[in-house]
């Protein structure tokens, strides 16, 4: 997977069933390959391909909707191209400085996505060289990408999702959110569109990924400073009896403004610029409920596991259904004394 938090969470859950596995992640200071199963950070694995010289039978990619495995630039020898055809691809169901900070963060996020795709291709190529019969399994709660649609071609119930090239061939199993919520495997979301204070991003143009320019968003947000203050006042009021509140801001500048209106002793701000040590410290404090409000910009949308979160405030626009579901999903984990998750959308996301 793409972040060390997910590597650690997945490893802990796997070993809770009484089995053992290794971890290969520089961020977790472990590089173990002697076990039958290895939970790896894609960045660490791709930088140390020679460490993966044993024949693995299965590659599992968590959050596989993030990865563009259909990249035509991936070069293989003719034997590897034949092996790739045999391998089954399957999936489970302001100031200039402030503007530069946001632009740099967006640029870094885009570079990371492209880099991750290339790194996944590198490790897949390496493992296929060792074992041409290795299989590929993708796991995701959101099997689609904006601009692409479904990331697989065929559903196991017989219908065709796409005739075009896709990262995965078949969906072999699907477990809808509605089913999990109805049977109380997940918490019921209570989604509310804010009617008093809200942002209007309708004049902005999104890119192919459904995201908006930080410069454009900052320009719009700076025209309405009272709106943000009013929104946070409502978040504090509605969240009085809530255990953990996550706030998703539009830009770094916006996140800092949001943070300034929250109780300082109960709040934390996480952006892509924060160092790993401080980030880990703040996340642990939030999970221990020492911090009630956690403001972030595009860094805690995937795989972040804090079951006590029972309120989500969305202050960023997106046209990506996948991203929206990932954001809401941060509040759907079951937890003690948690009856539902209040989701406040202040941006009019459809």
What are these regions (language model features)?
Residues 1-13:
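Conserved Walker A/P-loop ATP-binding site and its immediately adjacent core
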Residues 28-58, 69:
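Conserved helix/coil segment N-terminal to the catalytic DExD/H
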């Amino acid at each position: 997977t793409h972040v060390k938090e997910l590597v650690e969470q997945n490893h802990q859950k796997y070993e809770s069933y009484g089995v053992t596995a290794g971890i290969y992640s520089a961020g977790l200071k472990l590089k173990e390959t002697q076990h039958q199963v290895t939970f790896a950070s894609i960045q660490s694995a791709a930088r140390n391909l020679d460490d993966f010289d044993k024949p693995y039978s299965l590659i599992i990619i968590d959050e596989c909707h993030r990865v563009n495995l259909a990249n035509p630039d991936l070069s293989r020898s003719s034997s590897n191209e034949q092996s790739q055809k045999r391998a089954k691809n399957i999936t489970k169901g302001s100031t200039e400085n402030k503007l530069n900070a946001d632009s740099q963060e967006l640029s870094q996020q885009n570079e990371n996505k492209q880099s991750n795709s290339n790194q996944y291709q590198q490790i897949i190529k390496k493992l296929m060289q060792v074992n041409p019969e290795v299989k590929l399994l993708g796991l995701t709660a959101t099997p689609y990408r904006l601009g692409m649609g479904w990331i697989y071609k065929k559903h196991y119930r017989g219908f065709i999702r796409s005739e075009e090239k896709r990262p995965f061939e078949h969906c072999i199993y699907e477990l809808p959110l509605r089913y999990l919520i109805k049977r109380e495997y997940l918490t019921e979301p209570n989604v509310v569109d804010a009617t008093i204070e809200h942002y209007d991003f309708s004049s902005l143009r999104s890119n192919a990924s459904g995201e908006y320019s930080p410069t454009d968003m900052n320009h719009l947000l700076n025209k309405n400073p009272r709106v943000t203050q009013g929104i946070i006042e409502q978040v504090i009021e509605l969240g009085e009896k809530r255990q953990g509140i996550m706030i998703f801001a539009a830009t770094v500048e916006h996140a800092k403004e949001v943070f300034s209106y929250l109780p300082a002793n109960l709040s934390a701000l996480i952006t892509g610029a924060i160092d790993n040590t401080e980030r880990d410290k703040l996340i642990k404090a939030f999970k221990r409920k020492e911090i009630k409000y956690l403001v972030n910009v595009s860094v805690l949308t995937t795989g972040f596991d804090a079951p006590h979160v029972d309120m989500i405030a969305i202050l960023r626009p997106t046209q990506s259904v996948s991203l929206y579901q990932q954001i809401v999903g941060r509040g759907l984990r079951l937890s003690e004394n948690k009856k539902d998750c209040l989701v406040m959308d202040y941006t009019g996301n459809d």
